[in-house]
């Protein structure tokens, strides 16, 4: 009886409270739309530091070349279609009119070969053909052989797939002389096709001078499996949570992939999440169509929220096109455009149409730029930029909607996001990772579009999206040490320490909610890997500033740190 009276009283109170009060009762991480970030896998840079270059056999000088001397009057270079004669002049200008050795002539041929190689023409070389040279004044002729790919040999099992491979071969063989950038682009585009992985080699043509044959081998992987278990959830939805996904690669032989994801809290009534991704490569140049959809629902499980019968449901759909403007081993640039649709709902006491229950329906577009580059020092840089704009219409809720997740949040929003990172090896197994995230909005945002601090990347000592804001700056620094070992089945033993910091700002906060947040954390951990299939991340984290610390009281305008709390996290990931 008393419980029933209490529930009625609480319900009556909740109907009359403001959005500010709801924001304090329901943490941002447990509001609809925020659960998606838990199950999004961060983009991995495609760029890799340059490997060993393709090299053509050098031209060895004959015995006695270092002792044979001549006066060099002029150099004549024949067979070059890439460069004008004047572009070679700097390579031998200091030799003209001087007494030089025959070895110097062969060294000049090597410099010409190196010039071709530096510009990507790795199959081309300069030769010293047989000729009569006057020791008292010689005109030396150098013959350039500009190498090219005469033929690409693809495995016969590719004949059952949509034929992009003839296009790749045509692009590669049409270029004379062959440039490694062209060869690399089309082999990498082939390797981006779902479920197909390639190895290649080059062999000389049996009859044609300067010609080569590109031989390609393929490995087909029809299914990818992924699983993760961790304790990075929240008290209301976790903290133990899981994620599984299965990808069907190219089953229709039309260069498509379908991924189905099932995830949630261990107590699935608190949070259940379904996701699906379909993508298809439409052209041999890598133009790709994609559709991503997700559906999450649950009843967060703290005593307070259970008493209020708080429930959430969120749906998200996006569809668009992406195109690899640059696809190379050491640098990549991909541009995407998409339309998105979202429907995020929460309810108290099964009263979805009565405040403080919430309803956000958003429609809009995003433009994404994803770039990465590796440099000669071994560092890998990554850039991720997103421009998002929402529309009022097309089925969205209206601005000023009494059920909006934030009183002044707008559906016709505009925001930009930028993520930068660099991983730099320092030698001796030591490396450092630096990352920064920035979001800027010009109007107040609804909850699902706000930036969050807290989770696996930034704010690691905090729950996912422990803080949210319209505008954010977040920084991360991580020092790593790879431990050498002799275990063949161990792919990684790595110690690391990190520190991160976040500054968040809310535009037009309602009374009782935070305008500015300043939070930070630090920690250390151990990463282990087995056979590149299983990895374990164990870490201790300490929140050194921000809400979430024992004794902290959130007040408008600031967050004051008290006694720091320490947390232990684990992440176990497997893939096949």
Describe every region a protein language model picked out.
Residues 269-373:
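Transmembrane beta-barrel wall of Gram-negative outer-membrane proteins
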Residues 24-233, 263-272, 276, 416, ...:
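Periplasmic polypeptide-binding modules associated with outer-membrane biogenesis and secretion
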Residues 345-513, 549-561, 572-575:
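C-terminal outer-membrane beta-barrel translocator/porin domains of Gram-negative envelope proteins
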Residues 246, 528, 560-576:
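Outer-membrane beta-barrel "beta-signal"
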Residues 198, 223-225, 252-258, 284-290, ...:
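Repeated loop/turn-to-beta-strand initiation elements of outer-membrane beta-barrel proteins
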Residues 210, 238-242, 270-274, 313-317, ...:
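Residues that define the transmembrane beta-barrel architecture of outer-membrane proteins
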Residues 202, 227-231, 244, 258-264, ...:
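Transmembrane beta-barrel strands of outer-membrane/channel proteins
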């Amino acid at each position: 009886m008393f419980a029933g009276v209490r529930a009625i009283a609480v319900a009556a109170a909740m109907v009359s409270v403001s959005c500010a009060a709801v924001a304090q009762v329901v943490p941002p991480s447990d509001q609809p739309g925020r659960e998606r970030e838990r199950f999004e896998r961060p983009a991995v840079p495609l760029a890799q530091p340059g490997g060993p270059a393709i090299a053509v056999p050098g031209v060895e000088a004959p015995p006695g070349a270092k002792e044979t001397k001549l006066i060099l009057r002029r150099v004549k270079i024949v067979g070059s279609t890439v460069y004008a004669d004047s572009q070679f002049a700097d390579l031998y200008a200091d030799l003209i009119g001087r007494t030089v050795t025959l070895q110097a002539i062969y060294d000049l041929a090597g410099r010409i070969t190196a010039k071709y190689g530096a510009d990507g023409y790795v199959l081309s070389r300069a030769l010293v053909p047989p000729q009569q040279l006057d020791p008292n004044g010689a005109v030396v002729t150098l013959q350039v052989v500009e190498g090219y790919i005469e033929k690409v040999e693809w495995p016969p099992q590719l004949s059952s797939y949509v034929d992009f491979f003839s296009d790749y071969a045509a692009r590669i063989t049409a270029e004379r002389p062959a440039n490694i950038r062209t060869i690399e682009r089309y082999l990498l585009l082939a390797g981006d096709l779902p479920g197909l992985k390639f190895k290649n080699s080059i062999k000389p043509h049996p009859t044609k001078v300067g010609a080569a044959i590109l031989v390609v081998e393929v490995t087909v992987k029809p299914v990818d499996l992924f699983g993760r278990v961790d304790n990075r959830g929240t008290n209301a939805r976790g903290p133990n949570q899981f994620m599984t996904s299965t990808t069907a690669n190219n089953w229709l032989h039309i260069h498509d992939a379908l991924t189905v994801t099932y995830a949630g809290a261990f107590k699935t009534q608190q949070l259940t999440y379904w996701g699906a991704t379909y993508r298809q490569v439409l052209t041999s140049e890598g133009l790709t169509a994609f559709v991503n959809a997700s559906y999450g629902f649950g009843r967060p499980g703290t005593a307070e929220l259970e008493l209020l019968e708080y429930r959430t449901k969120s749906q998200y759909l996006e569809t668009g096109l992406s195109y690899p403007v640059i696809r190379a081993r050491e640098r990549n640039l991909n541009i995407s455009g998409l339309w998105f649709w979202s429907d995020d709902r929460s309810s108290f006491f099964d009263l979805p149409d009565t405040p403080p229950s919430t309803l956000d329906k958003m429609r809009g577009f995003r433009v994404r730029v994803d770039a990465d580059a590796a440099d000669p020092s071994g560092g890998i840089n990554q850039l991720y930029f997103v421009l998002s704009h929402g529309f009022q219409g097309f089925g969205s809720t209206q601005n000023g909607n009494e059920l909006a997740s934030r009183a002044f949040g707008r559906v016709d929003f505009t925001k930009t996001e930028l993520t930068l990172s660099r991983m730099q090896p320092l030698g001796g197994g030591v490396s450092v990772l630096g990352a920064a995230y920035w979001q800027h909005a010009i109007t107040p945002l609804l909850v699902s579009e706000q930036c969050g601090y807290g989770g696996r990347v930034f704010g690691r000592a905090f729950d996912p999206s422990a803080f949210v804001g319209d505008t954010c700056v977040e920084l991360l620094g991580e020092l790593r040490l790879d431990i050498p070992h002799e275990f063949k089945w161990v792919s990684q033993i790595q110690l690391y320490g990190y520190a991160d910091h976040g500054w968040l700002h809310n535009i037009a906060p309602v009374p009782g909610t935070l305008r500015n947040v300043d939070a930070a954390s630090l920690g250390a951990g151990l990463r282990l890997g087995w056979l590149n299939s299983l990895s374990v991340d164990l870490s201790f984290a300490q929140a050194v500033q921000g809400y979430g610390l024992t004794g902290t009281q959130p007040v408008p305008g600031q967050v004051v740190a008290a006694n720091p709390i320490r947390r232990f996290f684990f992440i176990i990931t497997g893939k096949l």
